[in-house]
Swiss-Prot record:
Proton pump that utilizes the energy of pyrophosphate hydrolysis as the driving force for proton movement across the membrane. Generates a proton motive force. One of its GO terms (molecular function) is diphosphate hydrolysis-driven proton transmembrane transporter activity. Pfam families: H_PPase. The record marks 179, 224, 231, 684, 695 as: Important for ion transport. It comes from the Bacteria. Keywords: Calcium, Cell inner membrane, Cell membrane, Hydrogen ion transport, Ion transport, Magnesium, Membrane, Metal-binding, Translocase, Transmembrane, Transmembrane helix, Transport. It catalyses: diphosphate + H2O + H(+)(in) = 2 phosphate + 2 H(+)(out). The lineage of its organism: Bacteria, Pseudomonadati, Pseudomonadota, Alphaproteobacteria, Caulobacterales. This is K(+)-insensitive pyrophosphate-energized proton pump. Belongs to the H(+)-translocating pyrophosphatase (TC 3.A.10) family. K(+)-insensitive subfamily. It comes from Caulobacter vibrioides (strain ATCC 19089 / CIP 103742 / CB 15).
């Protein structure tokens, strides 16, 4: 066993240890007065009840998949890999939720003391979630790779490759359910609560008289925290696995194959250490710039990662490796890793530009709100479409540069390096729901107005960090899916060239993705429609969930007038229960769409035109999903973020181009609320859920190849 494999496992354990130590420190902080603790307890109870029901539902699907893998592969390694990926992905999300629902009330209390203490508390809780995500993912992949080698399997053998792919499938399946189910819950509560509370009743956000308030705060945790944690766990694990699979295929038969397979694990290991160091640099300076404090930690992490990645690559690849006429040298691979870090920085800046309150896109949506509801929606849609251009161009440049440096393996190394910072990026994301909840608790507990000013300042930054991390997740998902597609084409080539007589692939010949083949066009079109259909199903699900919340909140206002006067407390649990049932019910069909579609397309085309065209159509489908999925996801998340922050700009006081001041409660604000209700499911449900949808489609295609190769 290589020392680097032990170091990767050790880095995973270090991340988990960091999480445990910081959690203990966080739990020692004051949880505020009795009223604050009562509200926090209600949020905790709702979040835990929802996630338990969600994971119970997912486990039923998981058991079916495990049984299918055991039947097809007739060995323990692949089913165990799937179970490990699923359990760790679920654990990452659940742990993130457990931390955030305890940090929210402590952040509210810390914010009553100072902005610096509020920032420190919120970011610490986010860092715990981030390091647990990175730690669990690295432990899962490196640990299971160690077990497979220790049980006598060859590193480049099909058992190791198929088992690691199965691990990625387990992570992907949990991720899409968590992302979609959590998104339906949180946006059903948010949209439903806003429509009745803000628009109809004229009461502010997080007002305790709104029966959907607790459900909204529960949703922040199960959607933005648990959902994002599972999403980035899956992207981290799947990309690492895909890079290892490519290394096993590209460098099979060379002395460098073991080192190349360890390279993604080693890069992730050193970047966990740099992320932990960077977390200690998040401090509020004299300027009181919250975003600057967070970026300070991110910059330190990125700067430290550069020499760390250089060292790892030069240790594992001391001399250039020649394969099929291409040279893979340490310097070329390092520049690929550096390109991954540059792409990360560029996507972060671009996303902040399109969603930050100080820039043209958000201001233009706020200005459009002056004219009314329709113009707000038109401008928001315009920004959502425009926001796809720069991220796509950034990814294009990244692909061209890394491919010319080191081919498809160079793209894989760039994506791995990009994702190696996931620990810190998740910390930025989990910061958002904690600050949002802290503001809600401060409002409901009746804390002094200056506390709400502090939590609002943190929440405004939290909205931007959530948008930024979504941009990062989408960009990394797009590149990660490209790596998976490369693994599909290389696996297909391997099985075709090494098929035993009588096997499924024997005598099949080469598969090409030629646009003159109508079945390739069919695959492209079929793959291209999936993100749109998936987005439509998830948006419809949020609409239905919101309708049920609107009906319940209206019923409570109508049946109990004492709620509006503050004499009677609403039945918060009713809205939570309604949303829990709705989210679980609505998430099933969209989540299974990317699992069933590749299998269905393959067998339908095989029946019509044969194996070669079926594999060509399936590969083209993967390309179609990647291209349209990337644009749909970016458009939805950035556009939704612009709508959300345009509303916040107006609530803080917006001066239009004619010098007129617009504030909360006016017609301009009502128009902005309408835009926000459209943008909410855009940015927090449909858009983010497209990420795992893209990757799970590719993972299923990879597993299908392995199953067919086993003689099914």
């Amino acid at each position: 066993m290589s020392l680097w494999l032990y170091l990767a496992i050790g880095a995973g354990l270090l991340a988990v240890l960091y999480g445990a130590v910081q959690t203990a420190s966080l739990m020692r902080a004051s949880a505020g007065n009795a009223r604050m603790q009562e509200i926090a307890a209600a949020i905790q109870e709702g979040a835990q009840a929802y996630l338990k029901r969600q994971y119970t539902t997912i486990s039923i699907v998981g058991v079916v998949v495990i049984a299918a893998l055991a039947f097809f592969f007739k060995s323990w390694e692949q089913p165990v890999g799937f179970a490990l990926g699923a359990i760790l992905s679920g654990a990452a999300g659940f742990a993130g939720m457990l931390i955030s629902v305890r940090a929210n009330v402590r952040t509210a209390q810390a914010s009553s003391e100072s902005l610096a203490k509020g920032l420190s508390m919120a970011f610490t809780s986010g860092a715990v979630t981030g390091m647990l995500v990175a730690g669990f993912a690295l432990l899962g992949v490196a640990g299971y790779y160690y077990v497979l080698l220790a049980t006598g399997h060859e590193a480049t053998g099909r058992v190791v490759i198929d088992s690691l792919v199965a691990l990625g499938f387990g992570a992907s399946l949990i991720s899409i359910f968590a992302r979609l189910g959590g998104g339906i819950f949180t946006k059903g509560a948010d949209v439903g609560g806003d429509l009745v509370g803000k628009v109809e009743a004229g009461i502010p956000e997080d007002d305790p008289r709104n029966a959907a308030t607790i459900a909204d705060n529960v949703g922040d945790n199960v959607g933005d925290c648990a959902g994002m944690a599972a999403d980035l766990f899956e992207t981290y694990a799947v990309t690492t696995v895909a890079t290892m699979v490519l290394a096993a295929i590209f460098f099979r038969g060379t002395e460098a194959v073991s080192a190349m397979m360890l390279l993604p694990l080693a890069i992730c290991a050193v970047c966990i250490v740099t992320s932990i160091i960077g977390a200690f640099f998040v401090r509020l300076g004299k300027s009181q710039n919250i975003m600057g404090a967070l970026y300070q930690g991110l910059i330190v992490t990125g700067v430290l990662s550069i020499p760390a990645v250089w060292y790892v690559i030069h240790q594992l690849v001391p001399t250039a490796v020649e394969v099929d006429g291409r040279s893979y040298g340490a310097d070329a691979l390092f520049y690929c890793g550096l390109a991954g870090l540059v792409v990360t920085a560029a996507i972060v800046m671009i996303t902040e530009y399109y969603t930050g309150t100080g820039f043209r896109p958000v201001k233009s949506v706020a200005q459009a709100s002056v004219s009314g509801h329709g113009t707000n929606v038109i401008q928001g849609l315009a920004m959502s479409l425009e926001s796809t251009a720069l991220p796509a161009l950034t990814i294009i440049v990244g692909i061209v540069v890394t491919y010319n440096l080191a081919g498809l393996f160079g793209i894989a190394i760039a994506t791995t390096t990009m994702l190696s910072l996931a620990g810190f990026i998740v910390a930025l994301d989990a910061f958002g729901p904690v600050t949002d909840n802290a503001g809600g608790i401060a409002e409901m507990a009746g804390l002094p107005p200056e506390v709400r000013v502090t939590t609002d300042a943190l929440d405004a930054v939290g909205n931007t960090t959530k948008a930024v991390t979504k941009g990062y997740a989408i960009g990394s998902a797009g590149l990660g899916a490209l790596v998976l597609f490369a693994a599909y084409t290389e696996d297909l080539k391997f099985f075709s060239e090494n098929a035993a007589p009588g096997s499924f692939f024997h005598g099949m010949g080469a598969v090409t993705f030629d646009l003159s083949n109508p079945y390739v066009v069919v695959g492209l079109l079929f793959g291209g429609l999936l993100p749109f259909l998936f987005g439509g199903l998830s948006m419809t699900a949020v609409g239905r969930a919101a309708e049920s919340v609107v009906a319940e909140v209206r019923r409570q206002f109508r049946d109990n007038p004492g709620i509006m006067t503050g004499e009677v407390k609403p039945e918060y649990g009713k809205a939570v229960d309604i949303l829990t049932k709705a989210a679980i019910r609505e998430m099933i069909v969209p989540s299974l769409l990317p699992v069933v579609s590749p299998v269905a397309l393959f067998f339908v085309i095989q029946a019509i035109a044969g194996k070669v065209d079926a594999f060509a159509a399936l590969g083209a489908m993967l390309m179609g999903v990647i291209v349209t999925g990337l644009f749909v996801a970016i458009s939805m998340t950035s556009g939704g973020g612009a709508w959300d922050n345009a509303k916040k700009v107006i609530e803080e006081g917006f001066t239009d181009k004619n010098g007129v001041l617009h504030k909360k409660g006016g017609e301009t604000h009502k128009a902005a609320v309408t835009g926000d209700t459209v943008g909410d499911p855009y940015k927090d449900t449909s858009g983010p859920a497209v990420n795992p949808m893209i990757k799970i489609t590719n993972i299923v295609a990879l597993l299908l190849l392995a199953v067919l190769a086993h003689g099914v």
